[in-house]
Regions:
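Histidine-acidic metal/acid-base catalytic patches
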Residues: 1-7, 15-32, 91, 145, ...
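Hydrophobic faces of well-ordered beta-strands that scaffold small-molecule active sites
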Residues: 4-10, 34-36, 69-74, 112-114, ...
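N-terminal-biased segments
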Residues: 9-20, 48-58, 95-97, 195
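Short histidine/acidic/glycine/proline-rich micro-motifs that form metal-
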Residues: 10-14, 40-47, 118-119, 155-158, ...
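Active-site acidic/histidine proton-transfer and metal-coordination neighborhood
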Residues: 20-21, 27, 61-65, 78-182, ...
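Glycine-rich, proline-tolerant flexible connector loops at the mouths of alpha/beta enzymes
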Residues: 35-63, 116-123, 222
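Short active-site-adjacent helix-start/loop capping segments
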Residues: 42-45, 70-71, 78-82
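Short glycine-enriched, charge-decorated loop/helix-capping segments at active-site entrances
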Residues: 45-50, 85-89, 127, 224-229
Length: 238
Protein backbone atom coordinates (compact mmCIF):
# COMPACT_ATOMS: atom_id res chain seq x y z
CA UNK A 1 0.00 0.00 0.00
CA UNK A 2 1.29 3.48 -0.90
CA UNK A 3 2.06 5.92 1.91
CA UNK A 4 -0.02 8.62 0.23
CA UNK A 5 -2.42 9.18 -2.67
CA UNK A 6 -1.75 11.69 -5.43
CA UNK A 7 -4.51 13.91 -6.78
CA UNK A 8 -4.83 16.05 -9.91
CA UNK A 9 -6.34 19.53 -9.72
CA UNK A 10 -9.21 19.88 -12.16
CA UNK A 11 -7.85 23.16 -13.58
CA UNK A 12 -4.68 21.37 -14.71
CA UNK A 13 -6.86 19.84 -17.45
CA UNK A 14 -8.58 21.54 -20.42
CA UNK A 15 -11.88 23.14 -19.45
CA UNK A 16 -13.44 21.73 -22.61
CA UNK A 17 -13.46 18.20 -21.17
CA UNK A 18 -16.62 16.93 -19.49
CA UNK A 19 -16.43 15.24 -16.10
CA UNK A 20 -16.10 11.72 -17.45
CA UNK A 21 -13.28 12.80 -19.76
CA UNK A 22 -11.47 14.59 -16.91
CA UNK A 23 -11.71 11.52 -14.69
CA UNK A 24 -10.49 9.27 -17.51
CA UNK A 25 -7.54 11.59 -18.21
CA UNK A 26 -6.55 11.61 -14.52
CA UNK A 27 -6.77 7.82 -14.34
CA UNK A 28 -4.75 7.36 -17.52
CA UNK A 29 -2.05 9.67 -16.13
CA UNK A 30 -1.78 7.52 -12.99
CA UNK A 31 -3.42 9.78 -10.41
CA UNK A 32 -5.50 8.45 -7.51
CA UNK A 33 -8.17 11.15 -7.38
CA UNK A 34 -9.25 14.53 -8.75
CA UNK A 35 -9.70 17.84 -6.92
CA UNK A 36 -12.75 19.84 -8.06
CA UNK A 37 -12.56 23.63 -8.39
CA UNK A 38 -15.07 26.17 -7.11
CA UNK A 39 -13.38 29.40 -8.16
CA UNK A 40 -14.77 32.95 -8.31
CA UNK A 41 -16.18 32.64 -11.85
CA UNK A 42 -19.96 32.48 -12.00
CA UNK A 43 -19.64 29.31 -14.09
CA UNK A 44 -17.90 27.46 -11.25
CA UNK A 45 -20.06 28.99 -8.50
CA UNK A 46 -23.14 27.80 -10.42
CA UNK A 47 -22.01 24.23 -9.72
CA UNK A 48 -23.17 24.74 -6.16
CA UNK A 49 -26.77 24.89 -7.40
CA UNK A 50 -26.58 21.76 -9.54
CA UNK A 51 -29.69 19.61 -9.53
CA UNK A 52 -29.69 16.22 -7.82
CA UNK A 53 -29.73 14.66 -11.29
CA UNK A 54 -26.57 16.53 -12.33
CA UNK A 55 -24.84 15.54 -9.10
CA UNK A 56 -25.79 11.94 -9.68
CA UNK A 57 -24.30 12.09 -13.20
CA UNK A 58 -20.94 13.06 -11.68
CA UNK A 59 -21.19 10.24 -9.14
CA UNK A 60 -22.03 7.84 -11.97
CA UNK A 61 -18.98 9.01 -13.93
CA UNK A 62 -16.75 8.43 -10.89
CA UNK A 63 -18.01 4.85 -10.53
CA UNK A 64 -17.84 4.09 -14.25
CA UNK A 65 -14.28 5.38 -14.59
CA UNK A 66 -13.09 4.21 -11.17
CA UNK A 67 -11.69 7.62 -10.28
CA UNK A 68 -13.05 9.57 -7.27
CA UNK A 69 -13.29 13.31 -6.72
CA UNK A 70 -11.90 13.38 -3.20
CA UNK A 71 -11.04 17.02 -2.49
CA UNK A 72 -12.45 20.45 -3.36
CA UNK A 73 -10.70 23.82 -3.75
CA UNK A 74 -13.00 26.75 -2.93
CA UNK A 75 -10.81 29.56 -4.26
CA UNK A 76 -13.97 31.65 -4.72
CA UNK A 77 -13.28 32.71 -1.12
CA UNK A 78 -10.37 34.78 -2.41
CA UNK A 79 -12.80 37.29 -3.91
CA UNK A 80 -15.61 36.63 -1.43
CA UNK A 81 -13.27 36.54 1.55
CA UNK A 82 -14.49 35.71 5.05
CA UNK A 83 -12.94 38.85 6.55
CA UNK A 84 -14.16 41.27 3.89
CA UNK A 85 -15.30 44.74 4.97
CA UNK A 86 -18.09 44.57 2.41
CA UNK A 87 -20.96 42.81 4.15
CA UNK A 88 -22.41 41.50 0.89
CA UNK A 89 -19.07 39.87 -0.04
CA UNK A 90 -18.72 38.26 3.38
CA UNK A 91 -22.29 37.01 3.25
CA UNK A 92 -21.82 35.55 -0.22
CA UNK A 93 -18.58 33.91 0.91
CA UNK A 94 -20.38 32.11 3.74
CA UNK A 95 -23.17 31.06 1.36
CA UNK A 96 -20.61 29.69 -1.09
CA UNK A 97 -18.88 27.78 1.69
CA UNK A 98 -22.12 26.31 3.03
CA UNK A 99 -23.19 25.18 -0.45
CA UNK A 100 -19.68 23.83 -1.12
CA UNK A 101 -19.93 21.61 1.95
CA UNK A 102 -23.35 20.41 0.78
CA UNK A 103 -21.98 19.55 -2.68
CA UNK A 104 -18.96 17.85 -1.10
CA UNK A 105 -21.29 15.77 1.05
CA UNK A 106 -23.30 14.69 -2.00
CA UNK A 107 -20.21 13.75 -4.05
CA UNK A 108 -18.36 11.95 -1.25
CA UNK A 109 -15.62 14.57 -1.00
CA UNK A 110 -13.60 14.36 2.24
CA UNK A 111 -11.62 17.61 2.29
CA UNK A 112 -12.67 21.14 1.32
CA UNK A 113 -9.73 23.51 0.97
CA UNK A 114 -10.27 27.21 1.65
CA UNK A 115 -7.69 29.97 1.08
CA UNK A 116 -6.00 31.43 4.15
CA UNK A 117 -6.86 35.05 3.40
CA UNK A 118 -8.76 37.40 5.69
CA UNK A 119 -8.94 39.63 2.60
CA UNK A 120 -7.07 39.52 -0.70
CA UNK A 121 -7.90 42.56 -2.81
CA UNK A 122 -8.30 44.92 0.16
CA UNK A 123 -5.96 45.99 3.01
CA UNK A 124 -5.72 43.56 5.93
CA UNK A 125 -6.63 45.22 9.25
CA UNK A 126 -7.38 44.19 12.80
CA UNK A 127 -11.09 44.27 11.91
CA UNK A 128 -10.72 42.03 8.84
CA UNK A 129 -8.72 39.56 10.94
CA UNK A 130 -11.37 39.51 13.67
CA UNK A 131 -14.14 39.07 11.10
CA UNK A 132 -12.21 36.25 9.43
CA UNK A 133 -11.86 34.41 12.74
CA UNK A 134 -15.53 34.90 13.59
CA UNK A 135 -16.65 33.51 10.23
CA UNK A 136 -14.06 30.74 10.31
CA UNK A 137 -15.56 29.53 13.58
CA UNK A 138 -18.99 29.46 11.89
CA UNK A 139 -17.46 27.62 8.93
CA UNK A 140 -15.95 25.04 11.29
CA UNK A 141 -19.37 24.40 12.80
CA UNK A 142 -20.84 23.86 9.32
CA UNK A 143 -18.02 21.41 8.54
CA UNK A 144 -18.68 19.55 11.79
CA UNK A 145 -22.35 19.11 10.88
CA UNK A 146 -21.42 17.81 7.42
CA UNK A 147 -18.63 15.58 8.75
CA UNK A 148 -16.18 17.06 6.23
CA UNK A 149 -12.68 18.41 6.91
CA UNK A 150 -11.92 22.04 6.12
CA UNK A 151 -8.30 22.66 5.18
CA UNK A 152 -6.73 26.14 5.42
CA UNK A 153 -4.33 26.65 2.53
CA UNK A 154 -1.13 28.51 3.33
CA UNK A 155 -0.98 31.46 0.94
CA UNK A 156 1.59 33.88 -0.47
CA UNK A 157 0.92 36.97 1.67
CA UNK A 158 1.89 37.80 5.24
CA UNK A 159 -1.44 36.84 6.79
CA UNK A 160 -1.10 33.06 6.50
CA UNK A 161 2.02 32.01 4.60
CA UNK A 162 3.27 29.44 7.12
CA UNK A 163 1.88 26.43 8.94
CA UNK A 164 2.70 28.18 12.22
CA UNK A 165 0.37 31.08 11.32
CA UNK A 166 -2.37 28.70 10.19
CA UNK A 167 -2.08 26.77 13.48
CA UNK A 168 -3.05 29.94 15.34
CA UNK A 169 -6.49 29.80 13.71
CA UNK A 170 -6.81 26.03 14.10
CA UNK A 171 -6.15 26.52 17.83
CA UNK A 172 -8.55 29.46 18.20
CA UNK A 173 -11.38 27.65 16.38
CA UNK A 174 -10.77 24.46 18.38
CA UNK A 175 -12.56 22.15 15.94
CA UNK A 176 -11.59 18.64 14.87
CA UNK A 177 -12.93 19.58 11.44
CA UNK A 178 -10.60 22.52 10.79
CA UNK A 179 -7.10 21.54 9.71
CA UNK A 180 -4.36 22.81 7.38
CA UNK A 181 -3.80 22.16 3.66
CA UNK A 182 -0.27 23.55 3.16
CA UNK A 183 1.02 24.79 -0.18
CA UNK A 184 4.64 23.64 -0.22
CA UNK A 185 5.60 26.28 -2.79
CA UNK A 186 4.26 29.11 -0.66
CA UNK A 187 5.91 27.63 2.44
CA UNK A 188 9.25 27.48 0.63
CA UNK A 189 9.04 31.14 -0.37
CA UNK A 190 8.07 32.12 3.18
CA UNK A 191 11.08 30.19 4.49
CA UNK A 192 13.36 32.23 2.21
CA UNK A 193 11.74 35.48 3.40
CA UNK A 194 11.99 34.62 7.10
CA UNK A 195 15.25 32.63 6.88
CA UNK A 196 13.46 29.66 8.44
CA UNK A 197 13.17 25.92 7.82
CA UNK A 198 10.24 24.54 5.77
CA UNK A 199 10.23 21.11 7.40
CA UNK A 200 10.39 22.59 10.90
CA UNK A 201 7.39 24.78 10.02
CA UNK A 202 5.46 21.74 8.74
CA UNK A 203 6.33 19.86 11.92
CA UNK A 204 4.41 22.52 13.88
CA UNK A 205 1.26 21.25 12.17
CA UNK A 206 1.85 17.55 12.81
CA UNK A 207 -1.52 15.85 13.30
CA UNK A 208 -3.31 18.81 11.73
CA UNK A 209 -2.35 18.50 8.05
CA UNK A 210 -5.04 17.11 5.74
CA UNK A 211 -3.14 17.26 2.45
CA UNK A 212 -0.18 18.91 0.73
CA UNK A 213 -0.46 21.13 -2.35
CA UNK A 214 2.54 20.31 -4.55
CA UNK A 215 3.40 23.55 -6.33
CA UNK A 216 6.71 24.83 -7.68
CA UNK A 217 7.85 28.38 -6.87
CA UNK A 218 10.83 30.70 -7.05
CA UNK A 219 11.71 33.46 -4.55
CA UNK A 220 9.07 36.16 -5.02
CA UNK A 221 7.31 34.18 -7.76
CA UNK A 222 4.31 32.11 -6.69
CA UNK A 223 2.57 31.00 -9.89
CA UNK A 224 3.23 29.33 -13.24
CA UNK A 225 6.69 27.97 -12.39
CA UNK A 226 7.22 24.64 -14.22
CA UNK A 227 8.14 21.66 -12.03
CA UNK A 228 11.88 21.22 -11.73
CA UNK A 229 12.71 24.85 -12.54
CA UNK A 230 12.09 26.26 -9.05
CA UNK A 231 13.53 25.78 -5.57
CA UNK A 232 10.96 23.53 -3.84
CA UNK A 233 12.34 20.32 -2.29
CA UNK A 234 9.34 18.08 -2.96
CA UNK A 235 11.03 14.86 -1.86
CA UNK A 236 11.91 16.23 1.57
CA UNK A 237 8.42 17.70 2.07
CA UNK A 238 6.58 14.51 1.12
Amino acid sequence: MKKYSLGLYEKAMPGTLDWKEKLEAAKEAGYDFVEISIDATEEKIARLDMTKEDRFEIIKAMYEVGMPIRTMCVSALTKYSLGNDKEEYCKRGMEILEKSLRLADDLGIRVVMIPGYDVYYEPSTLETKKRFLKNLKKASELAEKAGIQLGLETMENEFMNTVEKAMKYVTLCNSNYLKIYPDIGNLTNAAVTYQSDVLEDMELGRGNLTSLHLKETLPGRFREVPYGTGHVDFEAAI
